């Protein structure tokens, strides 16, 4: 079976050769958009300005909305969902409550990673009716491949809210043009953008066993969302057309709030009360003037996309007009503060929904987040309780996700146990350092120590420095840790068992849909 990456590449080429069949080109043309091919990356895109470069920050010149957003509607983080739900309700969509971020209804993933996960595979295949049709949902998602970028690029998260716009319709009721127009109207009416500030990219998407064409939308270097039109599913016997055409629009809640306010970093708009609290408690100073100069180029420091990260730091420092050392010092402290805010919210969602840190599966990644946050506190000698931070998040999000506040006691108990385990691991560090004084500490050794004994590399480097030994932690350390524990079970996404003759037998009622904490039933 081909990988998602291979499926996407092949289908993108096919769609680019016949855009009128796969994209809402008639609607784009009516609005004055024209199709172009990016001079830098060769992506096909649509704009109204004649600009020959696509909307991607690497091609268009970084983030250009910071301190100068073209959005005329200024929305705070909570206000983004409220405005979105209000407009889409008027346009015939039903706003529904989020699903748990712990994906117990699926056997191919531990956590929800996109809003469409709520409905795969059985709603997408037409075997189960959706809770509403069409619908919108503010869905928390967990992904662990960008941990090293959090706090640095200004836009990366392990936990983010994907605002989903979804529909599951037979061919005779499908209107791709209508769905595209609705999201275009969000950009114009919700954010208050003019067409000349919007760039649409032709692309393809594959994931969860499904694939199809998609339209990404950008403004001033920032991708705001991506509207996918699912046409096919991947099966062991080959690609198959879906019985239902599926709309899968995923929009970054955090990015839309950030863009709307035009602040130096999205973390300031996503966790406003928590960031203010952490600054006061830690005494950390975020140089907003320097950060405002840095953030337009921060996207260049994505460790997954850069071959020589040290050279990239030098290039960015030159653009900002400061030394590499000064830039790294400033960004390091702010990145630590923002990472603690981000990791604590991710843990709040996961633990409130029944997740549990452990040494296996998805629980391993939760433990990675918690220990990284505590390690950053140790490195900067900050004393803040994670329980207190989690409570601040829950209070701020109460108007969208009241269940987080209700489940705080459960979250606090788990965090207390994990902290005790972390403190125990710290005691091992000094004895290990003593044994390693005369050894080369390779990246592989750091990974083994973290994976087998839970010893954070930052803590190891700090203890080593105290005895005159230098240990360098790789920039992509946590991505490599997560990769060690990744599962590749793509076949499960749409593969279903052979149907049995069950005529006359009453339907089974899935009780866990009504209570996600219910894990044992009789039938």
Which residue ranges define each predicted feature?
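N-terminal alpha-helical interaction blocks
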Residues: 2-12
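A glycine- and charged-residue-rich anion-binding loop/surface
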Residues: 11-22, 29-30, 34-35, 42, ...
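Cysteine-rich micro-motifs
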Residues: 48-62
